[in-house]
Swiss-Prot record:
Protein name: Small ribosomal subunit protein uS9
GO molecular function, one term: RNA binding
Database matches in PANTHER family: RIBOSOMAL PROTEIN S9, SMALL RIBOSOMAL SUBUNIT PROTEIN US9M
Leader peptide range in chain numbering: none
NCBIfam families to which the protein is assigned, alphabetical: PRK00132.1
UniProt gene name: rpsI
Keywords: Ribonucleoprotein, Ribosomal protein
Keyword flag Flavoprotein: no
Length: 130
């Protein structure tokens, strides 16, 4: 019999993460690399583990992630969102705790576009009265 798999898609900024959860030992693989190798910042790795901490399922599932787009922070947020959605498939009772922790909400903040005549989205050249 095939092993149970749970899937979830997470998004944050320009990053999209496709996440698969398989019952296992808690190993996280991102783009065929270990998470410590792929994401060098420890604080971003903590973000990835938040859904497991909230639902008390640390070490229960192996995580396989395929993530594209964005940087480390956006990808970490997308992975967290995908794991939270996949955990909902594992047990729908997790919805309340995940929702209360804000892990099911898609973070809608995006980079503001650059405006013509300005140097960046809001940075203008210095104003001279005379």
């Amino acid at each position: 019999m095939a092993q149970a798999q749970y899937a979830g898609t997470g998004r944050r900024k320009n990053a999209v993460a496709r996440v698969r959860l398989v019952p296992g030992t808690g190993k996280i693989t991102v783009n065929k690399k270990d998470v410590e190798e792929y994401i060098p910042h420890a604080d971003l790795r903590l973000i990835i583990n938040q859904p497991f901490a909230v639902t008390s399922t640390e070490g229960s599932y192996d995580v396989f992630v395929n993530v594209v787009g964005g940087g480390y922070a956006g990808q970490s947020g997308a992975i967290r969102h995908g794991i939270a959605r996949a955990l909902l498939q594992v047990d729908p009772d997790f919805r309340d705790s995940l929702k209360r922790a804000g892990l099911l909400t898609r973070d809608a903040r995006m980079v503001e576009r650059k405006k013509p005549g300005l140097k960046k989205a809001r940075k203008a050249s210095q104003f001279s009265k005379r």
